[in-house]
Amino acid sequence: MAGNPIPALRPVVLRCMFRFRSGEGVRMRTRDREAKLAGQRIGFVGAVLVFALGGLLGAARAQTDCADGNGVLDTSPPKNMTAQELVQKFAAEETKIKEARTHYTYTQDVLVQTLNGKAVDGQFHEIATVSYDNQGKRAEKVSFAEQPTLRGIQLTAEDMDDIHTFMPWILTTEEVPQYNLTYAGQQHVDDLDTYVFHVEPKKEEKGKRYFQGRVWVDNHDLQIVKLCGKSVPDVVHVKKRQPMNIRPMFVGYRQVVDGQWFPAYARVDDTLNFQVQAIHVREIVKFTGYKRVGAGAAAAKQ
C-alpha cells in the first residue's frame, strides 16, 4: 500500500465531538416492549480506516467521545446472574442477530473526510446496497461513488473491510473465547439501562484483527446497543517509504429492526498525530433501510 503525497498541513489537535444532528441519526429511546419497537431509533457512531503516511512514525490520539449520552457508571454486579452467565446469554442473542441480519438488504452510506483546521479539504463518499446469498455471503452493489479527494490518507480494501466488520461488530458465542470480557458495571445510556463490558483480545494471531474497547448491553433484551473502540493491531512500518496503518477510535449505536438491535450508525471524529503533522479525520457510516427478503419477509412485517 503506497502512501499519499503529504500536503503541507499545520499540526492540529482538535476535539470536535458533537451530538447527533438532524439527518445523522436518532438518539436511543426507551423500549416500551412491542408497542414501541417500530418507533425506536438509535444513533450509531463509528469508523475504521487505514491511514497511509509514507515514511512517518507516530501514534493516533483518539478523540472520539465514548461517554456521549452516558450516565454515571454503577459498579454493582448484575442481579440474578453472574457476569459470566450474562456474557453467555448476550452472546447467544448476538449470534441470533448475526444470522438474522443475513436475511436483510440495507443501504450502506460511507462518508470519510479530512479536515485542515475546521475546513474539509478532501473526502470519500460511497453508497451501496448490501445483500446476502443463501450461504450468508455478503455482496455490495454500489449506487453512488464520487472521486476521492482525501488528503494525506489512503483508503484500501482492508479499510472497507473494517467498515463491514468492526463498526457493525456483533459478538457471537463462537467469538467469545477469543476475548477477555471484564464486567464494568451498569450504566444509563440515553434512555436505556445497560450492562457495560471491557473487551480485549486474549491473543493477537498474525493476519487477524480484533475489536478492543467497550460494549453496552441492553439489560432487558441482552443485546449490544452501543460499542466504542477500535480494531487492533495497528501496523507501523519502520522502513522508509512504507506506510503506517493506524485505526481511529469509533463509537457505534444500533436500532431496533423487527424486534432485534441491528447496527445503524457509525462515526469517527479523530485527530491522528504523527511525528511531523496531524491529520483530522471525520467519518460517518450509516446502515439504513433494512428490508427482510425471502420466505420470512411477510412474517417480519406482522
Question: PLM features: residue spans?
Answer:
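N-terminal secretory signal peptides that target proteins for export/translocation
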Residues: M1-Q40
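Extended interaction regions within the primary functional domain
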Residues: V13, V50-F51, Q63, W261
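Bacterial N-terminal signal peptides
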Residues: V45-L56
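Sec/Tat signal peptide C-region and signal peptidase I cleavage site
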Residues: G58-A62
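Structured extracytoplasmic
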Residues: Q63-Q212, H220-V225, K230-R247, Q255-Y265, ...
